[in-house]
Amino acid sequence: MASAAASESSSSSSSSSAGAANGQSAGESGGGGAQDSTFECNICLDTSKDAVISLCGHLFCWPCLHQWLETRPNRQVCPVCKAGISRDKVIPLYGRGSTGQQDPREKTPPRPQGQRPEPENRGGFQGFGFGDGGFQMSFGIGAFPFGIFATAFNINDGRPPPAAPGTPQHTDEQFLSRLFLFVALLIMFWLLIA
């Protein structure tokens, strides 16, 4: 019984080797020859166009791999196994029945055109871009600011007007003003006794 199983396995291996000698692989002899003859790109997972294969053995479309390499110029690694990869470390793959024998690495996909949206027109004087943006800058030494003239005449002051008396915002501002005055008086008193 063991000899029958051994002879059966040897006959099946000889028939598969005969099929391989005729140019058929095991996948093609099953009737799916057209489906197994295409290769999939490891980036877009679609049928590869202008196929290239890396030295580590992974297959890619050249446009996909080119975009991968262009977006990572400082760290060029294989998308699958992270081995070193570059334009010179890939091999073009030509299949049976392909019409073009041109190296796909020679044709790089065109770079997309940049689009610049037009800036919004706010109108009026921008004050070098600082007036409307809520940015205010003043400088001085101690209690003597150099912007006294600009502060006194309210030139290019982007702050809102003070709150009207009697509103909740006005009472909150008055409370904070008194609180900070009290803290300042405490600090001055502490400096005097220290």
Swiss-Prot record:
Database matches in PROSITE patterns: ZF_RING_1, ZF_RING_2
Compositionally biased intervals (Low complexity): 1-27
CDD domains: RING-HC_RNF185 (cd16744)
Entry keyword set: Autophagy, Endoplasmic reticulum, Immunity, Innate immunity, Membrane, Metal-binding, Mitochondrion, Mitochondrion outer membrane, Transferase, Transmembrane, Transmembrane helix, Ubl conjugation pathway, Zinc, Zinc-finger
Single Gene Ontology BP annotation: ERAD pathway
Domain remarks in the Swiss-Prot or TrEMBL record: The RING-type zinc finger domain is responsible for E3 ubiquitin ligase activity.
Name of the molecule in the record: E3 ubiquitin-protein ligase RNF185
Organism expressing this protein natively: Danio rerio (Zebrafish)
Originating gene: rnf185
